[in-house]
Amino acid sequence: MKEEKKLLLREVEEKITASQGFILLRYLGFTATHSRSFRNNLSGVSAEFEVLKKKIFFKALETSGVEMDPEDSEGHLGVVFAYGDPVSAAKQVLDFNKQHNDSLVFLAGRIDNASLSGREVEAVAKLPSMKELRQQVVGLIAAPMSQVVGIMNSVLSGVVSCVDQKAEKTQE
């Protein structure tokens, strides 16, 4: 193996090891402008996009001890390495696809040490984020509390009203 390829292989191995997960993509009609825009979007969620040869990527997976089936990935691969939350990176891919006519196709991925198919990665990307889930839970907790406060407020205003009426009757 040439020295350049060995260096690239080591670099990819390091990215696989350092990342929380990765997503394999096929890119169709992906221009330089799209690539720049996509990379900028991913940097906001601590992820990066690399175009790699299939052979080098799967060799790096093998030497890193990660098992994954190459599936139907041919030629060059687009790989998103997620150093933060891999689900957020998957969401960025999904959002980018909506804006750019599905120019990226999910092939496979690895999230939380679990290998996923392209469909599974896409399904994970469609789930609510942790932030959205927290907001929903807070909303579920806050709604009954606000109802209790409203009921207590109406009970107290009823008591005040009753006392006012009693005071008016005694003054008459």
Curated annotation (Swiss-Prot):
PROSITE patterns: RIBOSOMAL_L10 (PS01109). InterPro entries: Ribosomal_uL10 (IPR001790), Ribosomal_uL10-like_sf (IPR043141), Ribosomal_uL10_bac (IPR022973), Ribosomal_uL10_bac_type (IPR047865), Ribosomal_uL10_CS_bac (IPR002363). One of its GO terms (biological process) is translation. The keyword RNA-binding applies. Gene3D superfamilies: 3.30.70.1730, 6.10.250.290. Keywords: Ribonucleoprotein, Ribosomal protein, RNA-binding, rRNA-binding. Belongs to the universal ribosomal protein uL10 family. Forms part of the ribosomal stalk, playing a central role in the interaction of the ribosome with GTP-bound translation factors. This is Large ribosomal subunit protein uL10. It comes from Chlamydia trachomatis serovar L2 (strain ATCC VR-902B / DSM 19102 / 434/Bu). The gene is rplJ.
